[in-house]
């Protein structure tokens, strides 16, 4: 059974797409599918998506006309079969224990969403895949009302407004 559907919208991402996909494939938790949504790329990204799909049975590719980021994410959602859904941008690199850690907390807390922080890099030379995820002391259980109040009060808005850095329960 597929636990997580990872949706990666791709548009003109040739220079960093392989690093993104490789970081997802390196996950310690292997109960996932990857949905690459090529949003009309003309830089060779579409071909990279197809190459990975040929080698990995867990990867599905959707090719569509350019419709923007939300359109690409929605196309991925239409075929997502996982119990949970995660969005990763094509220029993102994820920690090798990200899924394992997030799923553990979600199941222990019976939560619908897991929100984690993001680190921004101008350029990544080498990704530290050995660093331990420090989750023990930073888990907060918040109700929808608490999150809503933080959004409207401007508290850590960047943590809540992006689709990335979250694992959502799929109520499909």
Q: In which residue ranges do the predicted regions lie?
A:
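Nucleotide-sugar donor-binding/catalytic module of glycosyltransferases
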Residues: 1-172
């Amino acid at each position: 059974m597929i636990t997580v559907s990872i949706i990666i919208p791709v548009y003109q991402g040739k220079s960093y797409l392989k690093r993104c996909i490789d970081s997802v494939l390196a996950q310690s938790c292997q109960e996932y599918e990857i949905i690459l949504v090529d949003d009309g790329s003309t830089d060779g990204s579409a071909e990279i998506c197809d190459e990975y799909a040929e080698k990995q049975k867990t990867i599905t590719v959707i090719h569509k006309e350019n419709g923007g980021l939300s359109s690409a994410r929605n196309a991925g959602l239409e075929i997502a079969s996982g119990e949970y859904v995660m969005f990763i941008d094509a220029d993102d690199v994820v920690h090798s224990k990200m899924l394992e850690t997030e799923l553990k907390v979600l199941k222990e807390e019976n939560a619908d969403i897991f929100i984690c922080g993001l680190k921004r890099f101008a350029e990544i030379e080498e990704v530290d895949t050995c660093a331990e995820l420090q989750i023990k002391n930073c888990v907060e259980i918040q109700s929808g009302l608490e999150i809503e109040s933080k959004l409207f009060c401007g508290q850590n808005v960047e943590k809540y407004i992006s689709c990335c850095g979250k694992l959502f329960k799929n109520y499909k």
